């Protein structure tokens, strides 16, 4: 696997800084010309190189990054943000499939990554709506596991079921290291 990791960097994030993709320095239209230039570089290789966007932006703009003339794929973080409820999962899947069609790209599915608590841990905690995604799990993590009761057996079963669902969906699945084992946050 030949790979370079071009990730976003946040130097400082204050309490007043939103992390939902609406900050004016994120998701600027000008970035798409840069990605089109990168695509031209990727296409000079034989075979052409692939790329995936780690774009924590508004869902309706996420698939702009996945166009064939740009990076080609983007992580579907709406799937990762879904709680273990039918409504959340169904909505994330339907939106992901629709957005992929609209951008002429493949659907992608991701349950977690290095920015959020592991899926087994999240699914072991109460599945209640919060004002920010993963708020319950982040609070639990920051309080050293003391803020909410954790049902590890339930979390492991849910995480494995979610992974099987992810792998059954059309498109590409991105499995974060340890997810296939149902590993918890440590």
Q: What function would you assign to each model-found segment?
A:
Residues 1-186:
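Active-site and adjacent substrate-binding regions of carbohydrate-active enzymes
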